[in-house]
Amino acid sequence: MVNDTIADMLTGIRNANLAKHKVARVKATKITRCLANVLKEEGLIQNFEEIENNLQNELLISLKYKGKKRQPIITALKRISKPGLRGYANHKELPRVLGGLGIAILSTSSGIMTDQTARHKGCGGEVLCYIW
């Protein structure tokens, strides 16, 4: 059985958004911390903090909503590179999500970053997910 912590994180955020929860609880790993940091820098989530449990650490991700009807800032999340089929792109082939309205998150040799940052630095890598 393959554990895909990135897909678990995206699913946790998606489910919490649909249920209009204030926070989403996800498993805390190095990559989920980096992904949460990128989401915070892009303004897609309010904040995140790590909670230490006896068995396993968790990340509490505070979600962002807009308007009186509490529409989520994150409308969709899509996992691209999966354990069974990895997806890579060099700096010339980096995808533009919804014509620049969304972001693609990449894992590069310089760390985890958005497509815009990777384009600016001129480095490619593994395309982890699309968020818009």
From Swiss-Prot:
Keyword Endoplasmic reticulum attached: no
Stored SUPFAM superfamilies: Ribosomal protein S8
Cite the entry's keywords alphabetically.
Cyanelle, Plastid, Ribonucleoprotein, Ribosomal protein, RNA-binding, rRNA-binding
Which BP terms does GO give this entry?
translation
Q: What does this protein do?
A: One of the primary rRNA binding proteins, it binds directly to 16S rRNA central domain where it helps coordinate assembly of the platform of the 30S subunit.
Subunit note: Part of the 30S ribosomal subunit.
- What is the name attached to this protein's record? Small ribosomal subunit protein uS8c
